[in-house]
Amino acid sequence: MRAATEAAGRRPLISAARSGGHGTHVKYRRVGDTDLEVSEIGLAVWPLSTGAWRGSDDEALALFRKAYDLGVNFYDTADVDGRGKGEELLGKSFAGNREMVILATKVGYDFYNDPAANGVSGSRRFDAEYIRYAVDQSLARLGTEFIDILQVHDPTMEAVQDDALWQTLEALREEGKIRYFGAALGPGVGHHDEGVFAMRKRGATTLSTAYNLLEQDPGRKFFTVALESMTGILLRNPFASGILDGTVAGPADVRTGGYATARSSAWVQEALAKRGKLEWIREAKDITFPQAVLKVYLWEETVPSILVETQDAAQLAEFCEAPEKPDYVREEIAEIAEQYRRNFDVPKA
């Protein structure tokens, strides 16, 4: 049973669009069959709380305020991001208006005992004792009595199949510490079997997956399953490590601490060539390329929110304008799928 009960701290949620507090282009979607309405553009917190961030805490908090003013009500972090830094920043930013935002975090990487645990590698624990400990620590850092969406961080197939893990999550929901639970797949793209099992067998409210126009598998296979299971698919890395938002124009632009640090020069060059083959999606709507990319993703009805990554207020505002731009039609979406099937007519690296 996925719906939160009164005992689990169910609360009426007013979306930013309906609160009258924002002049915004952002729109809102319901997450599966829950009572959560999230902004179609959500904010990934890791770029503001890890080694990728070179600014101050005050500058990070200012970007959170900017996002909120733009109508963003959905913020996604992980306890391992900055070793708790992401959660602490969210706690400070929304201490006075907690009921107006939806906070998602992740647990699983045991950075408390393993200095090498960083959200990509290192020790992962999914036993009941650890999960409970990690959730309590996250609640303290977030300064809240409940987590809206708790995600199991990069679960192995063994973890996904472990009844005790999901029984622990259900118990935490009944205790009111979390409202809903899901899984965040990783590291990187892939993990098809884990995702399908979590949706079909574990009642995951959300499934977070790395997905972009250049890396559509296995993400696109999740959409059909999500329709059946009423799961919300949260898209991470929507700009393909900076290729699709213009952050990366060549191998030299790859920033330390970002997704693209794991990419080879050959991958970057191939990805840039593919991006060039997609220029028509911008021209067709007379919008910016990042806006076109986001609008294509919003074609999928199982996607309640796209978790954008940015450290720039102007870029964030550009992203938040995407939902109001003209819709793509079925034939255009089909053409993108055909280009992907042909590898965009670009030789493989």
Feature locations, PLM:
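Active-site mouth loops of central-metabolism enzymes
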Residues: 46-58, 117-129, 158, 188
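Short, acidic/polar
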Residues: 54-67, 126-142, 189-198
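A short, structured active-site edge motif that brings together acidic residues
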Residues: 100-112, 209
